[in-house]
């Protein structure tokens, strides 16, 4: 399985993986409105052995098969003093 990865031009560190190159038709309108425009980054073969920096390959493959896209959001950063510890 191949994925086509696009970077949001509006939201830093936000990427969309598509099952078909340039086919944003399966991406919800709300998501497109918040993240578009997109720029193509790369094509990647999603083999079980493949490692991705911030996503699990099996999860990405499942989402592409079901929905035609996978949305990778930036990791949440927690700064010291922002968490309550019991």
Curated annotation (Swiss-Prot):
Q: Which domain of life is it from?
A: Bacteria
Q: In this protein, which residues make up the domain named YcgL? A: 1-83
Task: Write down what this protein is called.
Answer: YcgL domain-containing protein XOO0464
User: Mind giving the lineage of the organism this protein is from?
Assistant: Bacteria, Pseudomonadati, Pseudomonadota, Gammaproteobacteria, Lysobacterales
